[in-house]
Amino acid sequence: MQTCSGKGIKMAFLDVQSSSTPQSLPLLLFSHREGGGRGAGDPGAPAVVPAPVSAPRPASSPARSESRSPPLTLISRHITCCSCESPGDVLLSGRGGGGGGGGGARTGGGEGEDRRPRPDFSRVTAVAIPGWMEVESPPHPPPQPQVCPTPSQGAPGHGRAGLPEGKGPGGRDWLRSQSSRCSRATLFGHRAPSPAAPRRGRLPAPGFPSLHSAVSLF
């Protein structure tokens, strides 16, 4: 948990979607007001107030400076309250409204703010001031292990020490070649070839006779 210093308005940019229009809105600016409890059981909790967001206008309409607050649904909830010094889910879904009655909410337009729509609305992507809010990304799923041939595969009844010699299926040379191909396939993101699949060198080229038919011509 990061230690936050300073008091006042603390902001974070969050990804949102509008429930009234299919077009995704840009970034919603949240202002963090200290004091003024949100719930009855926690009078000291800071209030999270959504600031007005400039609605996307059609290309044909003239530019206007006014802004309205469409219904907003927060997608990202992986964030930690930093001003109250305790981890918790302080983001609330609701209707964006005019600053909570003059509580110090500020609209967007500051330096470094990106107003372009973002294609991904699954997590918090930007923070206004680093160190004031700690962003927690969702945990990534563990990578699936690559299934590579082992000495027990393809050679039933043979242990690691009793492998049959030779280049046939189950032999040491065969397992070594399969393991090397498996590692190369894992490196390039492809699945390893199945042992039962024919080798590429044995396939005749399209439009040409096979080796046996070519030999039989002479």
Curated annotation (Swiss-Prot):
Which parts of the sequence are annotated with region: Disordered? 30-71, 93-120, 133-209
Q: Which residues form a coiled coil?
A: none
Q: Give start-end positions of Gly residues composition bias.
A: 94-110, 156-171
Q: Where is the composition biased (Low complexity)?
A: 43-71, 191-209
Which residue ranges have biased composition labelled Pro residues?
Answer: 138-148
| The protein's name | Putative uncharacterized protein FLJ45840
What organism, scientifically named, is this protein from?
A: Homo sapiens (Human)
